[in-house]
A protein has these predicted regions:
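Alpha/beta enzyme core
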Residues: 1-44, 58-69, 74, 87-88, ...
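Short, ordered loop/turn segments at secondary-structure junctions
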Residues: 20, 52-53, 77-79
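Conserved short-loop catalytic and cofactor-binding motifs
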Residues: 24-28, 52, 107-114
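Extended, intrinsically disordered, low-complexity segments
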Residues: 91-141
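A near-ubiquitous, low-amplitude feature marking generic local secondary-structure context
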Residues: 23, 47, 69, 102-109
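A hydrophobic, small-residue-rich beta->alpha segment in the mid-to-C-terminal subdomain
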Residues: 68-99
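Short beta-strand/loop segments at the ligand-binding rim of alpha/beta enzyme cores
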Residues: 42-52
Length: 141
C-alpha cells in the first residue's frame, strides 16, 4: 500500500522497486523476491523499473516482465565490460607513433574500439533478453 500511496501522492509514471536488487551491484548474483514483485504489480497500475539489473538472474527476466517490469537499468556490467576490454587492449600498446591513431580515431589502432564492440554485443544481448527489439510500431512511426 505504500507504493500505491506514493504513486497517488507524486503522480509518477514508473515505479522503481526494491526486490533484492542492488544499485551498482558488481559481484555475483542475487535472488530477486519475485513474490514481492508480483504483489506490488497487483496493487499498482503503472510500469515497474528494476535498478541494479547486473546480477539479476537471466532466467528470471521473463517472470519479472510478466509481473510488470517495463524497464531494466543496466549500467555496471556495461561499464565493467568496456573498462576490462580497454584495459586488456591498452596493455598491448608498446610504441605510440601518433597518439591520435590510438584514442578516438576509430581506426584499427584505436584502443577504445574493442571496448565499444564488446558493449555493442552485450547491449544487443540485453535488448533480446528484455524483449525490447521490434518495438517501433508501438509508437506510430
Amino acid at each position: 500500500n505504500k507504493a500505491k500511496n506514493f504513486i497517488n501522492l507524486t503522480n509518477i509514471d514508473f515505479l522503481g522497486v526494491s526486490i533484492g536488487n542492488v544499485h551498482m551491484f558488481s559481484k555475483g548474483n542475487y535472488n530477486p523476491q519475485l513474490d514481492l514483485l508480483s504483489r506490488i504489480n497487483e496493487i499498482v497500475e503503472i510500469p515497474l523499473v528494476i535498478h541494479g539489473t547486473t546480477g539479476f538472474p537471466e532466467d528470471k527476466i521473463d517472470l519479472a516482465i510478466k509481473n510488470g517490469v517495463a524497464m531494466f537499468q543496466v549500467g555496471t556490467i556495461i561499464k565493467e565490460t568496456f573498462f576490462n576490454e580497454i584495459k586488456k587492449n591498452i596493455q598491448n600498446i608498446k610504441i605510440i607513433d601518433n597518439v591520435h591513431d590510438y584514442v578516438g580515431s576509430r581506426k584499427e589502432k584505436d584502443f577504445l574500439e574493442p571496448g565499444k564492440s564488446k558493449i555493442i554485443d552485450l547491449i544487443s544481448k540485453y535488448i533480446n533478453l528484455f524483449h525490447s527489439n521490434n518495438k517501433k510500431n508501438l509508437y506510430g512511426k
